[in-house]
Amino acid sequence: MAVMIRSPGRQRSLLMLGDLIVVLLTTVTGFANHGELASAGLSRMAATFVPFAFAWFVVSPWLGCFEPERVTRLTDLWRPPLAALLAAPLGAIVRGLWLGAPVIPAFAVVMGAVVAAAMFAWRLVAVSVIRHVAGAGG
């Protein structure tokens, strides 16, 4: 594993993949919590996942969420949750356009908060792993 995440490019790839998984799991969990997991179908879930993933990758680089000197500092762990909160309105707007439906502000707030919390947890794990690998000879 150490060889895989030593370089900044590989760290960035790991973070991006993990971020996508966080948005995907948040989407699936949301459908499950609303009792719609079985009935929703892939296209309906994609109509939530894709816009919020898109919004995440539009907003997060502006807050330095993938900069090598920032992703390993615990003092910079505020960046991904803030990026998630700022990306949520854009994700909700893109989702509304995709579905041809009104944008529900409460949905954007809840999705932003849940993704922010999940992103914080994931990035805390990622920082620990990256720092451990770097300390082990990376």
Region locations from a protein language model:
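Signature of alpha-helical transmembrane segments in polytopic membrane proteins
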Residues: 2-138
